[in-house]
Amino acid sequence: VDFPGGAVVWRLAGDIWHMAELFDEAFYKRADAHIALANEETEEASHEAVNASMMFASARFCAFLSARGFKNGDAMGAKREETVDYFVAGFRQMLEGNLDAYIRNFDAYMNSKDD
């Protein structure tokens, strides 16, 4: 699928979206750094508040990333729905994969949960 701003990032393999070329060691290191920061923030704020902040930050960065691919706001606006669909599809795939991992490994992942 072409990124609405012009870059090709997502590729369709069967019925599964993936970004294989981006899922390298550095990818997971960056993700872990964001998770570590979120975990630190839960010392001062609720998990729900931290999650909302992370979602907002991700959405804001996605909007910025998208804007970089357009010449003006009108061109960006013309691709608004396509852009939303693109990012929602990616988030959905990642969320479903992580939910499935937690379902399969619930006891191992949550054995230290206090509440």
Region roles according to the model:
Residues 19-115:
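Solvent-exposed interaction surfaces and binding hotspots enriched for charged
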